[in-house]
Each structure stands twice: as C-alpha cells, then as structure tokens.
Amino acid sequence: MRIPNKKNRCRHRFRYSIRVALVLGMLVVLLAGCAMLPKPTRSDRIGESGALGSCADFFAVLDKKSGEAGVLDPAEFRVKNYPYLRVNRFIASFREEVDDPAAFEAWSDRMQALDRDARRYEIDNLPDQAVAMLDSVNGRTGLYDKVADCGDLLKQADFRDIEPRQQMRERVAASDEYIGLRRVLGIYPLASLFVSHGVSRWHATARSSFSIEPPVNWEAIRYVPEQKTDWESVRQILATAKQDALGVPVYSPEQQEALFRMYAPVWEIQIQGDADRIGTPIWTAKGVLDVDTRRPLTYTVLSFTRFAKQILTQLNYIIWFPARPKQSDWDIYGGLLDGLNYRVTLGSDGTPLLYETVHNCGCYYKAYPAKRLQVRAKIDYAEPPLVLQAPDLDPAENFVTVAMESRTHYVRHLYPLAREMPPAAQAYPLADYGQLRSLPYSSADRRSMFDQYGLAPGSERLERFILWPTGVLSPGGMRQWGRHAVAFVGRRHFDDPFYMDRMFLQTDTR
C-alpha cells in the first residue's frame, strides 16, 4: 500500500481548496446572475412604417441607452411587448377585474403613469452625451414629451379591440422578490427550519421589549413635523375624495400634502452618536452614498391596499440614518446606511386602522393594529408577522411617536404625544420619495440612490452570506420602495395588496 508523503498531502489539500474556491466562486456568480434586473421590452410594432413604428423604435432605443448607462429604474415591473406600461403589485391585482371598458382604461392609464414617472428619472440620470444622441434639439424636455406622446399613440392603437386587451391582461405580472434557484441550491426546506427558529427568538425578544408608553431615562433626539394641518379639513378630503373607475381614491397634490402633514409622526431616537441622527441621502465627491444629518428629511410615498372589499389609503414615512454601526468586525447586521418606513393605513373616516414599521432592508416588520381590527386566529403565512399592540389615540389630538433605540434603530416604543405641547425638538420637512430616484452625483451627472437591482450600493451586510438560501437578494441591504420582501420563510411583500385580509378581520369597535 502506497502512503502519500507530507508533500503530496499538502499538494492534494491545496488542489482541493482551489476546486472548492472555484465552485463557490461559480456559485456566487450564478446566484448573482439570477437576481432580478429590470427587463426592458419591445413593442410588436417595431419595424412598422409610420408614426407607430417610429414610436416603437424610440422606446427600444431609449431602453437600450438607459441599460447601457446603468440607469434603468427597477421600482416597477415591465409589461411584455408594451414598453409604455409598468405595473406594481397593487395595480397588478386588478387584472381579473377590468372587463368594463372604463375600468380597463383607468387601469392602463395608471400603468402608463408609472412608466412615464420612471422614465423621467431614467432620462434625468442619463449622461448628457446619451441625451444628445436621442434628442439633439430639445434634450431631456423633448424626451419627456416623446415618452408621453408615443405612449398615448401606441396605447390607443394597441387597445382598440377586446382581444388585444385580453392579451395584455395575461401579460401583466409583478415578480416576487425571491430567487427560486437560491432556494433550490441552498436546500431551502432545511435552511428554513433554522431561519424560523431565529425569527421566533426575535419575535419573543421584540415583544418583551416593546411598549406603548414613553421610554424612561433615554437620552434622545426628537424630530417633529415642520408643518401642521387641520383635522377637519383632512376628514373632508377623505370624505369627498373622487375615485377612478377602479375605485381607487384620487387626490390632488395639495390634498396629498395635507394628508401627509396630518399623520406625520414624531421620531424619537436614543442617541449615542451621529449614526442615530436622520438626514438626507447624498452621493459624496468620492462616489459613495452617505446621509447628511445636517438636513433631516422624512420622505413620503402614497400607496393603497385592499381590505374587506375596500381600497384604503396608506401613508408611508421613510427616514435614513448614516449607518447601523458595527459592534465588531464580525457583526453581520451592521454596515453603512440604515432606515425605517413607518406606514399608516386609514379608514374611510380618516381614523387609522393599522400602523406598521419595517426597516428599509425589509427586515424587522411589525404591525400595530388599532381596535377596529381583529387579528385572525390563524394568519396564513409560512412566517407569521409580528403583531404588537397599537396605542389608543385620537389623531386630532395626538402625534404618534416612533421611538427607536440607539445603533440598531429597532422600534421599542409607539406612544401618543399631545399636539398642543410639542416637545423640544428639531423640525423636519417632508419630501417626495421620488427625489431619491435621481440625486446629484457630480457637477453634471445624476444617479439614483438605488442600483438596477433596487439596492443601495454600499449597504450590503455580512448576513447575506448566511441567509442567501432564503432566496432574498442581499439580505440586510437597503432597498428601493416597492422591492421589499418582508419574510425569510415563505413569501411576503410589504406592498402585497391583500396582506391585511390575510392578517385581520374588521370589527365595529370605534
């Protein structure tokens, strides 16, 4: 029997290590390639003569230039063969409910509006050279106009008859935020057992540390809304709001602003350093993301959800911190950038039905139902959400205060604070979340805060090397609104239009 000497054993180990490293490297590349980049689509009218063919060609060239520049915006999802339409999960939920011509028109109008909005940011972020190649005369303004005009022209031609409308309906889909191949390669059924155990432990800890009373002996900084609004005027807005043919409320910009001012929270953060101050995301001169804490802002997103055969208005308030500081080099949760989304779901009378918080990574989701909601005895999710008590308050008389602990920015307290006696605090203005989709990048260029995967560059966490079998792309990384998976076990999204029906029943309690 031949016994390998020490030198041969070392050589074999080295070769084995190289093979393992190559396999792991190929696996990482493969898994990264499975992530969900925006998928531009081409109109079937490409190559036609006349205005329709010209417009189809225009969208194809615009998408090509946007892709080459790396500025494709991933907030919404494309509709195959209809480059002038995009869809989110809420709009996609009406796919089987638009037989009526008026409903179909309202539905397609909303999809076109999403596309026009996204393309405006993409055009803003295009390098000047690319813009000049697309429209050397009118520049970006000419491109905005052409997006609108060509979208109108193609939509009118594409949907004259019932059959093409049905064809489009079948192609409308909002992809989920889970990569199936990762779950296969990561032996998800086994991995999910360990993840479920960790989630259960976090739920227990979060329950025991949560309170609807103010924190005691905290050294904290408070931020209060810069502007106030009148409760009765807000109730009037909600009571008289018009609806489109889908039943979705339609608010003017001024009405939206009044709603956001009315329900804006007080932010209270236990402070130990600059990482506990909120601010404005910026691109630095070195081309990296940071948060300027000298300019505290709260970003707003208007959304809608479907509950008990109603369409409810949701107000999202998003803040950003410079970091979640690491406790050590091996801290898998710490890193650059952190943030929180606080959401209020309103009843038709303006009374909040549900408060929610989730970190901007999609992590640490918490629901705080008001008395008019009853938690279902069995919530039909593989990973049940954490449901906590909501404070009992009158929004006309009280702010909701969202109190977070230092460093982790976990929400530890949700409590009422009288509007007549505002605390010593720093005032914050509200800003449209869309601003983050096109930020100043250099002296002339602009860039979204988020890359084409919907992630904030530089916000990656070490936990992504542990939790990749869950199928979530870059767990712990900060994400663009509309791209938040909020569970590691099963599938659940922050903007799921039917999540409230799966979690709650409506009661008559006022």
Describe each PLM feature range:
Residues I3, M36-L37:
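Short, aromatic- and cysteine-enriched interfacial helices/patches
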Residues P4-L22:
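Bacterial N-terminal signal peptides that target proteins for export
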Residues V23-V28:
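Sec-dependent N-terminal signal peptides
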Residues A32-G33:
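C-terminal motif of bacterial Sec signal peptides marking the signal peptidase cleavage site
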Residues L37-V234, L336-D338, D349-R510:
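Domain-length functional cores that host ligand/cofactor binding and catalytic or interaction surfaces
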Residues E219-D292:
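Charged, compositionally biased non-catalytic regions
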Residues R277-Y355:
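Short N-terminal edge-element motif at the start of the domain
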